[in-house]
Structures are given as structure tokens and as C-alpha cells.
Regions:
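C-terminal charged capping/lid subdomain of soluble metabolic enzymes
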Residues: 167-169, 263-336
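Non-catalytic interfacial helical region
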Residues: 67-84, 95-110
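Glycine-rich beta-strand-to-loop/alpha-helix junction loops that act as flexible
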Residues: 55-56, 86-88, 224-225
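ATP/NTP phosphate-donor binding region
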Residues: 1-82
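Active-site segments that bind and position negatively charged phosphate/pyrophosphate groups
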Residues: 183, 187-287
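A glycine/threonine-rich phosphate-anchoring loop and its flanking beta-alpha core
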Residues: 97-189
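Short glycine/serine/threonine-rich phosphate/pyrophosphate-binding segments
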Residues: 90-97, 119, 231
Length: 336
């Protein structure tokens, strides 16, 4: 990736793993679903210790976090070592937080193996785990020493997981107004143009993060669709994937934007939902979502900060009265 400086390399292409270099001894934690790809990386980096973990939200817990820390301490893994993390977004979030806190910080390398992780979790330095009370309530801003998004790892990805990850790329289209990202994405990992498409999506996030690393201003726009999404995930017991939840969150945001005087983006978002084919919305009542929304980490003194799309490439961020949210949610239920 060129022209945007984050202080570490971000490579998005086939064979990106070959460019990775890690100082000191290397430990590897990886999603057990990608063990073959992880072993290739492990051999290239001369890994001395490794641990396989299940993917999914169950790994973003205090229990698993403690397990990894204790395992590193048990083998005496040193501060000058590096942690290589291979997997989807949940593993990258967990692994980055382990690296941020073990011995008060060790180097780590990120090898995202899903479209969602490549476009979202791998770049930006957000690490963390969940609590029973909500998502990402414990964490740290901590950068990797390199991100290596190897498109070869997508070749065995199930189609629904491949498609689901591109919801974040579509979100970046809504934020940037880029017509390529607003169009329907490439249909599969072998499609021509996928590399350029993903590079463009990652570049949008890199540009925002370069302005505002600690999410005190411009970076908050990246939460578009995520307030409802995180509540949906929690209220449904994480039976919905993050990608599905964000897609529904984007539709809710589009309705909110129209209600507050913005451009009508609803048809565009619904077209993306049809392409994605998420599971049917569970018809949760607003009262079931509200406790999780009110605990949202984006909450400020005046209330939860909603990211409101007023047009492709233009958003506002601020609180919205609950009466308005309740009304919009009823419209949302009629559409889904």
C-alpha cells in the first residue's frame, strides 16, 4: 500500500506472507480452521511455539485471553520476541491485545485470513476482547509491526464468509463515496479485480486512521452501522455473524440518515443486502437492543454517538433522541 504512512507496512496481495519479517524468537497463535496456511507461515518465520484456537467470538473472552498469556509465561517467552497472529478478526483482536499486554508489550505481526479481517480488523491498532456486558469493552490501541493480507488465504474461504467480510468494504464506500466500493463486490476469491478492490477498501481505512489513531474525531465515522450491529450480536447471543449484523446496521443507519434530511441511500444498501443474503433478521424488540446500545463504548456525555450517513461520502456523528430511534426501528423492521 502506498502514499499513506501508518508506521508499519500493510501488504494486500497474493503472496504477501513472503514479505513478513519478525525480530527475536517467534510465537504463533492461529485459528485452527486455517492450520495449513498457519503452518506455512510458521515454517517461514521459524516459529518456536504455537497455539491453535477456535475462531469466532468465543475466543475474544477473558478466559481465552488468560489462557494465551499463561501459555506464553509458562514457556518463558521473552519481551524481545514477536507474536505472529493468523486468522480472522476475532483472533487478530485477541492476539493484538495479548501482544499489547504481555510483558507490557511485545511486537506482533498480523496475518488476516478473511476478507473481513483484511478490510477491517488488521489495520488501525484496535485490539481487545469482549465481556458478557458487551463487545470490545476491554482493549488497547496497539499497532502491529506489519500487516500481511495474503489473498492466497482466501481461496479456501467458504463463500458466505468471503461475501460477509466485504460489508466493511461497502461501508468504506458509503464513507468515501468511492463508486468502486459502492458497486457490488467481486463474487469470489478468484475474481479479477479483487486485489485492487481490497487495496482500495483498506486504503480508505488507512487514510482515516492516519488522521485519528485514538478515535477522538474522524475515526469515529468507521463505526457506521456498528452501534446497532454490536447490540444485535449481543442480544442474539452472538448467533449472528459480525458481517451480517453490520449489514443490518447499515440499513438502519441509511433510514436514520434519510429521516434526518440526508440523501436516500436505502435502495443502495438493500441491493447490497440482497447480494450478501444474510440470515433473516430476528425481529428483536427495540427494548431488547437498548440495554446493549446504552453500554456502547462510543457513548459520550450527551448519549450514544450515532454515525449518520447524509450522502455517499458525507456523515454526521452525534446523539439521536430515543423517540426518533424507536420510530426508525419500526420502519427498519418493516423493510427486513
Amino acid at each position: 500500500m502506498k502514499n499513506i504512512e501508518l508506521g508499519y507496512p500493510v501488504e494486500v496481495k497474493a503472496g504477501a506472507r513472503a514479505q513478513a519479517q519478525a525480530p527475536g524468537p517467534v510465537a504463533l497463535i492461529y485459528d485452527q480452521a486455517v492450520d495449513r496456511f498457519a503452518n506455512i507461515i510458521g515454517e517461514a518465520l521459524d516459529v518456536e511455539w504455537k497455539l491453535a484456537l477456535p475462531g469466532g467470538e468465543e475466543s475474544k473472552s477473558l478466559t481465552v485471553y488468560g489462557k494465551v498469556l499463561e501459555a506464553l509465561a509458562q514457556v518463558g517467552f521473552p519481551r524481545q520476541g514477536s507474536l505472529a497472529v493468523v486468522g480472522g478478526g476475532t483472533l487478530l483482536d485477541l492476539g493484538g491485545f495479548v501482544a499489547a499486554t504481555y510483558l507490557r508489550g511485545i511486537s506482533f505481526l498480523s496475518f488476516p485470513t478473511t476478507t473481513l479481517a483484511m478490510v477491517d480488523a488488521a489495520v488501525g491498532g484496535k485490539t481487545g476482547i469482549n465481556l458478557p456486558q458487551g463487545k470490545n469493552l476491554v482493549g488497547a490501541f496497539y499497532n502491529p509491526i506489519g500487516v500481511y493480507a495474503d489473498l492466497d488465504s482466501l481461496l479456501t474461504l467458504p463463500p458466505n464468509i468471503f461475501r460477509g467480510g466485504l460489508v466493511e468494504a461497502f461501508k468504506h464506500g458509503l464513507l468515501s463515496g468511492d463508486p468502486v466500493l459502492l458497486a457490488l463486490p467481486p463474487a469470489g476469491p478468484a475474481e479479477p479485480g479483487l486485489e485492487a478492490y481490497l487495496q482500495k477498501a483498506v486504503a480508505v481505512k488507512m487514510a482515516v486512521v492516519a488522521q485519528d489513531f485514538r478515535e477522538s474525531g474522524a475515526r469515529r465515522q468507521l463505526n457506521l452501522g456498528h452501534t446497532l450491529a454490536h447490540a444485535l450480536e449481543a442480544a442474539s447471543g452472538h448467533s449472528f455473524s459480525h458481517a451480517e449484523a453490520v449489514a443490518y446496521g447499515l440499513l438502519f443507519a441509511a433510514l436514520l440518515g434519510r429521516a434526518l434530511g440526508g440523501e436516500n441511500l436505502i435502495a443502495r444498501v438493500r441491493d447490497f443486502l440482497k447480494w450478501l443474503t444474510p440470515r433473516p433478521y430476528p425481529q428483536l424488540a427495540w427494548s431488547e437492543l437498548l440495554p446493549f446500545i446504552e453500554r456502547d463504548k462510543k457513548k459520550g456525555p450527551a448519549g450514544v454517538r450515532w454515525v449518520i450517513p447524509l450522502a455517499a461520502g458525507k456523515v454526521e456523528i452525534g446523539p439521536v433522541p430515543n423517540q426518533v430511534l424507536t420510530q426508525i426501528y419500526q420502519e427498519f423492521l418493516e423493510l427486513v
